[in-house]
Amino acid sequence: WIGGLYFLFSIIFLIDIYDESFKKTLTNFFSFNSSEVLKQAFKIFLLYSGITLIIFIILNIFSIRSFDSLNLAFSLISSGGFLPVNDLSNIIKDKTQVIILSILMLTSFFSIFFSFNIIFLKNKNINFFYEDLHLIIYYIVVVTIFFLFFSFNNEFSSNLLSISSSMSNIGFSLETNQSNLNLVYLVLVIIGGSFFSTSSGLRFIKIYSLFKFSINQILSFSRPKNIFMNKLIFTKINFDFDEINKYFLTVLVFILSFFILTTLLSISGINFENSFKLSILTLMNTVNSSSYGLSDFNFNNLNFFIKYSLIFFMIIGRIELLTILLIIKKFLLKN
């Protein structure tokens, strides 16, 4: 829980050097001074603590005992993936609880400021909502596809839990045999959630921005007389070329890290399929479960080198190597 809070604080401190467009979804200030940083950090602390308390209360209302509710509240808000028991089915007993848990998982999928912006709607322009609006559409589309095409042999509530858990990079799920959907859930893990959330992943808005920029570049060559704006729906913010480069480098760093870690795991004797899955979950800080076909994977059998490699790449996946490079460029390579 503290790690998730610290991660959100770090976004505030790094936003000035990392992403100009995302800063506009947080504040109207052109640059963060110390008072603005403290203001946003205090707001994060209140929201983070308040949402945790609300999750705890809701879980209690739906007959989940207090100790389990507290553990789940800490895990859900921080995308931690920790359980007080070995099997989630020992806590979640019926379909109603499964659906409620699936919805509560979205607290770490959407921006931590989403609820705050809704409450104080009158003081906000569309820029404060555009990422979450995209995420709402993305979530509805994915859930609809699963409901129509992947819910014949499995209960939809179990699929909904796996979807929310994967999108939020939490990872745990009910024990189900869905080997045909393992890759789909892994893709959802890679995409991730909001920039201002405790979820990991490459972030949906970055992938969508790269996709739109690529399409515009292709169209600009086929229709040179037309002007194509790098602007997403629900916003007036334009993505400049420098930000697109940062998004591309983020994807490049992930691919490079994924290739190195998969190679290390394969060399250590783990079969390629498990190495592939474990590398994605490690870089995206997502716990292994039956949704990804790794519920029975035994980490005790790994040697020390592989264990430390997993720890190292968890850190790389969380803070992003690109962030470190940007800090070096900002403070050490000013000239």
What are these regions (language model features)?
Residues 1-335:
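Membrane-proximal intracellular helices of multi-pass ion channels
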